[in-house]
Amino acid sequence: MTIYNINLGIGWASSGVEYAQAYRAQILRSLGMPAKFIFTNMFQSENLEHFTKNIGFEDNEIIWLYGYFTDVKISGTTYKKDDLEATFSQCPTKKEASSDRKLIRYYFENQELYINASLYGENQEYVQRVEYVVKGKLIRKDYYSYTKVFSEFYSPGENGVQLCNRSFYNEDGSIAYEEILSNEKSTFVFSNKICYGLEELLEFMLEDLSLTKSDLILLDRATGIGQVVFENIGAAKLAVVIHAEHFNEKNTDEHNILWNNYYEYQFTNADKVNAFITSTERQKILLEEQFTQYTSLHPKIVAIPVGSLDQLKFPEQSRKSFSMMTGSRLAIEKHIDWLIEGVALAQKRLPELTFDIYGEGGERRKLTELLTKLHAGEFIELKGHKQLDEIYQNYELYLTASTSEGFGLTLMEAVGSGLPIIGFDVPYGNQTFVCSGENGLLIERPKGDDRSRIVQAFADSIYEYFTKFKMADAQQYSYNIAENYKHEKLVERWKDFIEEMLND
């Protein structure tokens, strides 16, 4: 019996989907249930293991689609510079290191060749990627973990060089299979099989897993692969995990519903799904009502929170007065800019206010510029990516401007540290973790997302909280809500669900 969890990618700034999987991995470990987490994306800029280990997965829990067909194990990068240099057919005549020591360039007597090695590790002692450049043109890249994992080969193209081939290796250096790329299409060539495209490669892997009725597939992301998974699960049971708002409210009326395109295939083929999993009871009830109203299908839907709390966290010393925080990817849909402007406005009435923003992402530069523009750098700070477990409880208030959260892991963690919350009155996370007037405030989202009204509403709510709320009562209310999300309760819910699925 194995529980296979299927996803696409993962990165340093992981989304709630990956964090939900990491929480699930902890629970399945505690239940002693074998689990594998499958990632189907290609990883070039970073070793997949560094991403998965960073978020809490164990190496033996990970399956990488491209690595599945080799005997190279999921592992951190430990291939040494000395090992690389031992493969050179001639000694370098010169070495140059970049200022940050993350790149070393080797020059040889043959002036037409140089080699770039991207380094990894605290002392940059390991090699992660190597580029071979001849006559100023890239011809090959090699990627390493504890051994060479795969190589990419390049040929001249209209706009410089273009990737034309990949070779994936076994531990002994032999080629396990090759990927031929042409016109952005891939053909995977094995000794006994050819797969035309990524979908056929995934199909090949699913067939090789020899899934039985004792196996369970949990489909977390399905973009581009949903149909392949549905058609190749064999006798295994299939559950689809809903991580976000599942429909478009603006384009839904009493006769027609517009499903979220990420879930449309799954919902259209709900008769082939053993269960759908939402993270909140509110979303479960709504989805049940919508299936009844808009379709003839009545699938099984269960609500299981995507995260849990090992324990409630209490401050070792007094929380910093007038302190606020948020934690999320610095992505446009998180609307951190609204929070910054709202805090800057509120600070004019409450000069003691401070606001710390945890997370990384593509919006960092814009947010930095906004802080400069508002002259807010002294009381609002971008703190970068941090493990927040022991950080929440040092603050007095949590802010969120997300307009949709399927669950909101940081919201759960915030109430688990006694933090009241201010955010929009929107499904599903905010409405699950905040009782407006008790442990924070829910703000009505204005039509058209009127920026000035939103900023003013956040400023007014922050002022109201710090001047009118009894903080001790609000904090206790958050702790009371968090009790329902303690680890042992979630373990039982997963245990019951899995047993029901496999025994059905």
Curated annotation (Swiss-Prot):
It is an enzyme of class 2 (transferase). UDP binds at residues 16-19, 385-386. It catalyses: L-seryl-[protein] + UDP-N-acetyl-alpha-D-glucosamine = 3-O-[N-acetyl-alpha-D-glucosaminyl]-L-seryl-[protein] + UDP + H(+). Pathway: Protein modification; protein glycosylation. InterPro entries: Glyco_trans_1, GtfA, GtfA_EBD. GO terms for molecular function: glycosyltransferase activity; nucleotide binding. It is a peripheral membrane protein. It is found in: Cytoplasm; Cell membrane. Disruption phenotype: No glycosylation of serine-rich fimbrial adhesin Fap1, an unglycosylated version of Fap1 accumulates that is larger than the wild-type protein. No further defect in a double gtfA/gtfB disruption mutant, but biofilm formation is further decreased than in a gtfB deletion. Keywords: Cell membrane, Cytoplasm, Glycosyltransferase, Membrane, Nucleotide-binding, Transferase. GO terms for cellular component: cytoplasm; plasma membrane; protein N-acetylglucosaminyltransferase complex. Its EC number is 2.4.1.-. Its main location: cytoplasm. It comes from the Bacteria. SUPFAM superfamilies: UDP-Glycosyltransferase/glycogen phosphorylase. N-acetyl-D-glucosamine binds at residues 243, 405-408. Pfam families: Glycos_transf_1, GtfA_EBD. GO terms for biological process: protein O-linked glycosylation via serine. The keyword Cytoplasm applies. Belongs to the glycosyltransferase group 1 family. Glycosyltransferase 4 subfamily. Interacts with stabilizing protein GtfB (Gtf1), probably via the N-terminus of this protein; probably forms a heterotetramer with 2 subunits each of GtfA and GtfB. Part of the accessory SecA2/SecY2 protein translocation apparatus. Required for polymorphic O-glycosylation of serine-rich repeat protein Fap1. Catalyzes the first step in glycosylation by transferring N-acetylglucosamine from UDP-GlcNAc to serine residues in Fap1. Part of the accessory SecA2/SecY2 system specifically required to export Fap1, a serine-rich fimbrial adhesin encoded upstream in the same operon. The GtfA-GtfB (Gtf1-Gtf2 in this bacteria) complex adds GlcNAc from UDP-GlcNAc to Fap1, attaching the first sugar residue. Cannot use not UDP-Glc as substrate. This is UDP-N-acetylglucosamine--peptide N-acetylglucosaminyltransferase GtfA subunit. It comes from Streptococcus parasanguinis. The lineage of its organism: Bacteria, Bacillati, Bacillota, Bacilli, Lactobacillales. The gene is gtfA.
